[in-house]
Amino acid sequence: GLRERVPFPQTTNVPTVAERAGDFSQVYRDGGPFAIFDPLTTRTEGGRLVRTEFPNNRIPAGRMSPIAQKYLSEVYPLPNIANQRQSNFANTVNKGIYNYNAEVARLDHIFSASNKIFGTFFRNHRDEFRSNNGLQGTVANQGQWPQTRNNHGGIFDWVSTLSPSAVLNLRAGFTRFLETNFQTDVQKFDAKTLGFRQLPGSYMPRVNLDQYTNIGVGSQGVNTVDNTGSFQANYTKTFSRHTLKYGGEYRNIRSNPRTTGNESGFFNFTRAYTRRDPNSQDATSGHSVASFLLGYPADANIGAGQARATQWNYSALFVQDDLRLTRKLTVNLGLRWDFEGPLTERYNRLVRGFAFDQASPLADRVRNAPGAANCPACANLKGGLLFAGVGGVDRSLFDPDRNNFQPRIGLAYQLSSKTVVRGGYGLYYSPTGQFGPQTGFFISTPYIAGDLQGRPGIPEIGVNTFENPFPSGRAVPPGASAGLLTEVGRGISFDDPKRIVP
């Protein structure tokens, strides 16, 4: 076992007592005056956008977000370094905790001079406790608390001497890897106690305040389960000057990662909504804590999605001849064939390429749209995402690539009783390790804020606030139901199903 403790002392910024009360009268930038402005007063004067300053740089209590106030009173730690607005919170005892245990057991049995077996069982367990923001032990913590990795499996091996010149070796193995990253303290927390009503789950939303320490995790963490089963067979035959080796290998790999993004919500607050001019980046106005107290995030989102349940097979065959040409010269000749089977997903939650040759469902509308005559590409609009196992599309992510032959050659020459020169050449193919995009099966609902640039309509900024960030609810992943119209008008990604193994 291993026990390791690594110090991670942190000094960061947290809102001051005055800022938590909406009082920014003592805030200065570069020694000069500083002001916060009311975003609901945005108007045009003399061709420029202007806002009215909050009197005395204080936000009225009636304008403050109840959720933001609860965050600042119940979640954000108070400063512990006096008389400082910046670098006013220190955690000198913040440390990473790493615990690792490993067990290995092996049993050998010899049946006879020509047959023997062994079996091995192994297991290891690792816990990592590490805080990224120095708030370990609280619901505001970010980081691994804990991140747990478990790995266990076994091997069975049989060696049989078939004759004085022939040996057969068979081996089977299985490995299971589990990884979780859940915040134990956050699991005890109910986000509804802060005033949230629409957000699913109990995990605290992730909140970023520009120039301040960030809090919360925004999701229920990561949960991954990977299983690998394998079988190998090797046969060695010696005759004359030759040592021939034949063999093969088969693996079945199953990977089940669960990552759903910010399923409890992510909110980012900047100076934008409390600046003097929304179109101007000046250093003497606007404050992220002021924007937070007003309940106006610059951007936010909430995610929803499903896990993966992927599987693929790997096979290989090889032959090798160690030929002793002379007493001093040995030549190794070999050939290996690898086949990485196409990846599939248990419920076909994969994008499989792009329909370059299929007419878009929007083709008629685009062809008849005003100005289409000046758009050559509009005359015959094609394309859209294709989904595994839908509409006759193959379930696999890639087409099979079965021509991965790899020649090998090596030389060993004995120059003297103390010197041997060796050289060789080999061609190798790399595993792709591609899981493919899940467009349509994961979706992020964006926060629709007021007009950040201060154009007409800015007074409607108060409609969507911290209290009601997603009035239409969280979007539901459509899966493959939209067909070629999936993510239309947005950026998309896909893997070429005819890709070549590098």
Where are these regions (language model features)?
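Short acidic-glycine motifs
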Residues: 1-502
